[in-house]
Each structure stands twice: as structure tokens, then as C-alpha cells.
Amino acid sequence: MQLSALALATLLATANAHFTVYYPGWRGDSHPTQTQGPCGGLNKIGERFKVNGKSVDVLLKTSHTSAITEYRLCLGDDCGTKSGSDGQKDFSKVLYGPINELGAGNFCMPGLPLGDLKDGQKGTIQVIMQAVDGNLYNCIDFEVDNSVDAFNAVCKNSTGVSAEAISNANAGSLAENTQGSGNSSGHAHGSSGSGSASASKTDSKSSAASGSASATSAAASSAASSAAASASATEEKNSGSLAYVNGALAIGGVVAAALLI
């Protein structure tokens, strides 16, 4: 039996896809080399986007139907300028994850916590997505400007896009396989999902939030369960994105229960 051209194209786009950082922006177009860590094969600092020093919304566009996703941080002027494991050493701090991102389209991580950074501080956020085609990498170079709003209205999920916590996840697992060489030019650039940031509700299938590796505890798990139950009861009344942020349940970009900072 032969596959139709449409079916084959769909299969390739699903099996070998990439992701883009819509907001605040990425180091550069990494599609040809996105399998190369730590920054998708881009070893030169790009445009530094202005972000609030406490938290930042991150909006991704992905064509994967499922991808384990993790966010990491490096502070400094030259983060991620080396290839492979040498460059990955810069990103030792896990901001959030890993979580399981579900559905193709726009995926918003609201209120990604940066701590309490001061004006003028520079750094880079690394996003790793692990899907059927292996690890994919992108980096966000930034400079802190605390006059910038921490929340952005464009950061909303596409219809059908959601995220779920991963119980007992190893926050360092995605970074361990960072490659410094390789060529992903054979990957198809999938385009499924809405290109606009249309609002939708995000389901949460887990009552336990997967916070940063250094902030897991029985008390936090219990509190996260309570937050998830509360959110479930009011889900129909809320619109916008729903995601676990640093152990807290966030709806429409607003942290509902800040459990782990």
C-alpha cells in the first residue's frame, strides 16, 4: 500500500518537526541546526530582548503533538556560545520542568520565574523540547528592564494545546543528551496548529506540579494537589492558558497559587 503525498507530508511533519520562540523572541532561526545544543547550533549572542527581572512569559510555536519541555537559565554576557556539552554547562539552573506539552500550535508558559534580577542584568533562557526526533534547542537572549510588564497578552495557547506535569521527573534528563554536532536539515518543518495566539483553556491531567529540581517536597505536592482541584472546579469559568508554573497553577498568565519560588 502506498501513502498519498498528503499523508506522507503529514507523517514527516509530525515525526521531524521543529519549534519557534514567538515571544519574547529567539537567538535566531535555528531550523536547519535545531538538534544541536545548547542553542540550536547558534553560538553567537543575538538580539537581547527586554524582560522583567521577576518573570517572563514564553510563547512557543510547535508542530509536535507531544514533547517533553524544559526551561533553563544562564546569567552572563556570553551564555551558550560554546557547542555541545561545554556550552550546556552554562545552563545548570533549571527554571521549570520538565513538563509534557501536548498538541501542535502555540504553547504559552506564563510567568516563568527568573527570581529578582536587577536592571541591566543579562542572560539567556534555554528551551529544550524532546520529541520523537530527539532533543531540539532554542535560546532567548535577554537584558533585564523592570519597567517591562511581566505578563504579555499575546501569550495564549492555541485550541487543543495543553500541558501536564510529569511525576517524579528528573529535571536534568533533557540536558544530558546535548549534542554539539549533527545536521537536522533533513527534518520537515511542520506547520500544524494556529499561527495566531488564540485563547483557549489548557487541561491539566496531573494534580502534582513539577517544579524546579531543587524545590520538590511532600508539602508542595499536597499544595499543588489542592490548587489543581480548585482549578478543576472553576475551569469552565476561565479562559486563556492553564499551566503549572514553578509548582503553582497559572490561569491566563496569572499565578493562582505560588507554592515554590
Swiss-Prot record:
Signal sequence bounds: 1-17
UniProt-annotated binding residues for Cu(2+): 18, 64, 133
Region (Disordered) residue spans: 174-210
InterPro entries in alphabetical order: BIM1-like, BIM1-like_dom
Membrane topology: Lipid-anchor; GPI-anchor
Domain of life: Eukaryota
Glycosylation sites: 157, 183
Subcellular location: Cell membrane
Record keywords: Cell membrane, Copper, Disulfide bond, Glycoprotein, GPI-anchor, Lipoprotein, Membrane, Metal-binding, Signal
A single GO cellular-component term on record: plasma membrane
Protein name according to UniProt: Lytic polysaccharide monooxygenase-like protein X325
Encoding gene (name): X325
